[in-house]
Amino acid sequence: MNSALFLAKLPEAYAIFKPIIDILPVIPVFFLLLAFVWQAAIGFR
């Protein structure tokens, strides 16, 4: 499996997507915050 090596060294064509790839691990945290805000909005029923 060289996928980790491939992802660590992206080709030049995908260099513009690097900021997006850096943000990807944070997305589950946003879902957690969204769930909390949603529950707060409906009053924690």
Curated annotation (Swiss-Prot):
It is found in: Plastid, Chloroplast thylakoid membrane. InterPro entries: PSII_PsbK (IPR003687), PSII_PsbK_sf (IPR037270). Residues 1-8 form a propeptide. It comes from the Eukaryota. Keywords: Chloroplast, Membrane, Photosynthesis, Photosystem II, Plastid, Reaction center, Thylakoid, Transmembrane, Transmembrane helix. It is a single-pass membrane protein. GO terms for cellular component: chloroplast thylakoid membrane; photosystem II reaction center. GO terms for biological process: photosynthesis. Its main location: plastid. The chain crosses the membrane at residues 23-43. Belongs to the PsbK family. One of the components of the core complex of photosystem II (PSII). PSII is a light-driven water:plastoquinone oxidoreductase that uses light energy to abstract electrons from H(2)O, generating O(2) and a proton gradient subsequently used for ATP formation. It consists of a core antenna complex that captures photons, and an electron transfer chain that converts photonic excitation into a charge separation. PSII is composed of 1 copy each of membrane proteins PsbA, PsbB, PsbC, PsbD, PsbE, PsbF, PsbH, PsbI, PsbJ, PsbK, PsbL, PsbM, PsbT, PsbX, PsbY, PsbZ, Psb30/Ycf12, at least 3 peripheral proteins of the oxygen-evolving complex and a large number of cofactors. It forms dimeric complexes. NCBIfam families: PRK02553.1. This is Photosystem II reaction center protein K. It comes from Pyropia yezoensis (Susabi-nori). The gene is psbK.
